[in-house]
């Protein structure tokens, strides 16, 4: 048996087993759990790319590793499928606040998975592990979307997952297209406009000081 399991208290093992069993039989929308009978601390997952994002139509394999200090310490998350995303490093490590500073012991695996799915809709360039993806997201969304979509088409093609989850905070945020009208495009177009306006204002002040 894996050492992580051996180091977990019996009541935590029961909690994890119960939650994984529930997630397997009643998964959130667009998420599928692949149970690991030999090691329940290694949670294998398939996540469907949300509509209205460059990840749409992709199936992404990932895993959560529950360490010996779980649930006092958060699980570690990794994408096993290659993905172009600001908050996912080249080795697949996921940077999301709920897995770090915002973690609480009462938060379960379902919450973590829904948060990671949300990250596909609303990336956070401020905590980028992939600096190139973070820069493009802020400065050139069309190029970012093109790169992310290409990676999805190459590495993440698969059949559609089934399932609905009314507690999914991101389910109502989906749209029908990737560029122009998708939730990511609208958000970052607004951010880009604000930054351009601020830059113009700063440039104008500098020009006036030179007069």
Swiss-Prot record:
The gene is ube2s-c. Residues 158-211 are annotated as: Disordered. PROSITE patterns: UBC_1, UBC_2. Belongs to the ubiquitin-conjugating enzyme family. It comes from Xenopus laevis. One of its GO terms (cellular component) is anaphase-promoting complex. Pathway: Protein modification; protein ubiquitination. One of its GO terms (biological process) is anaphase-promoting complex-dependent catabolic process. Residues 197-211 have a biased composition (Basic residues). The active site is at residue 95. This is Ubiquitin-conjugating enzyme E2 S-C. It catalyses: S-ubiquitinyl-[E1 ubiquitin-activating enzyme]-L-cysteine + [E2 ubiquitin-conjugating enzyme]-L-cysteine = [E1 ubiquitin-activating enzyme]-L-cysteine + S-ubiquitinyl-[E2 ubiquitin-conjugating enzyme]-L-cysteine. SUPFAM superfamilies: UBC-like (SSF54495). Residues 11-157 form the UBC core domain. GO terms for molecular function: ATP binding; ubiquitin conjugating enzyme activity. Catalyzes the covalent attachment of ubiquitin to other proteins. Acts as an essential factor of the anaphase promoting complex/cyclosome (APC/C), a cell cycle-regulated ubiquitin ligase that controls progression through mitosis. Acts by specifically elongating 'Lys-11'-linked polyubiquitin chains initiated by the E2 enzyme ube2c/ubch10 on APC/C substrates, enhancing the degradation of APC/C substrates by the proteasome and promoting mitotic exit. It comes from the Eukaryota. Its EC number is 2.3.2.23. Keywords: ATP-binding, Cell cycle, Cell division, Nucleotide-binding, Transferase, Ubl conjugation pathway.
